[in-house]
Design a protein with these regions (language model features):
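Conserved blade-ending motifs and adjacent loop-strand segments that build the rim/top face
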Residues: 181-207
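Blade-loop segments of beta-propeller domains
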Residues: 4-42
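Structural signature of eukaryotic scaffold interfaces centered on beta-propeller domains
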Residues: 23-36, 79-96, 138-143, 200-211
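Beta-propeller blade signature
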Residues: 1-8, 50-62, 106-115, 162-180, ...
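A short beta-strand motif characteristic of beta-propeller blades
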Residues: 11-17, 66-78, 119-130, 184-192
């Protein structure tokens, strides 16, 4: 997994390789006095490529870190769970862990301090009530009382199941973190003319007016590019 740091204008200003950590569907970025700490899935299952644990690692530009490195702590808050992906609510100091148990997708929410101390007593343990049959999970975010969940696929051709003329099947669902109830679901209609247009990543940019940010992947001849759209959360 390669983590790339981008400037607001889209220029690459740093990168780090994480080997054996996982797929990287969602992750957290925690500012610290010494720089930036990354919350990522870790201990990838060799059969699937998805993480079986959560790690918190410092970002070090230009370096390579192995999941099996000595001294790296792998948090395993949910024994038996698979495909674990973390993200952070920096405002309220909470950790959200997306995970699967059997065929069921779920979320667990922890206080950051408790999680780091390996006190894995969740504030909330929530079955995903928003994910519909056949949908592809593409990321999640936690802010205040809501989980924001991104789903969707890249465009197919016009004869396929997700043609550009239909506007794509990208959706954001809002889940109440206390009750687990899905309280809203909206199709993302931004940039319908993008080539490929696969939804890949969602986050909340905190501030006096928080913004919900959604990334759409664009396939070009030599690489993929990313376009990010924001709206009021």
């Amino acid at each position: 997994m390669c983590l790339t740091v981008l400037s607001p204008s889209g220029d690459s200003v740093g990168h780090m390789y994480l080997r054996g950590f996982g797929h990287g569907i969602s992750f957290g970025v925690e500012p610290s006095d010494g720089g930036v700490l990354l919350w990522v899935e870790s201990d990838a299952d060799p059969r699937t490529g998805y993480g079986r644990a959560i790690a918190r690692v410092p970002f070090r530009d230009g370096t390579v870190l192995d999941s099996a490195s000595a001294g790296l702590r792998h948090h395993r808050p949910l024994p038996g769970a698979r495909r674990m992906h973390p993200t952070l609510d920096l405002t309220n100091r909470r950790v959200l862990v997306s995970h699967w148990v059997g065929r069921r997708h779920a979320y667990a929410v922890y206080r950051t301090e408790d999680f780091l101390a390996q006190r894995y007593e969740p504030l909330h343990n929530i079955a995903d009530t928003a994910l519909r049959k056949g949908e592809t999970f593409q990321g999640c975010a936690l802010h205040d009382e809501h989980i924001y969940q991104l789903t969707g696929n890249p465009y197919t051709d016009e004869a396929g199941e997700n043609p550009p003329s239909a506007g794509g099947n990208t959706f954001v669902s809002t889940i109440d973190v206390s009750s687990g109830r899905t309280v809203a679901r909206r199709r993302v209609t931004a940039a319908p003319g993008l080539r490929f247009r696969e939804p890949e990543g969602i986050a909340v940019r905190p501030g006096s007016t928080p913004e919900l940010c959604i990334a759409l992947s664009v396939k070009t001849r030599d690489r993929r590019k990313l376009t990010v759209y924001s709206c009021g959360s």
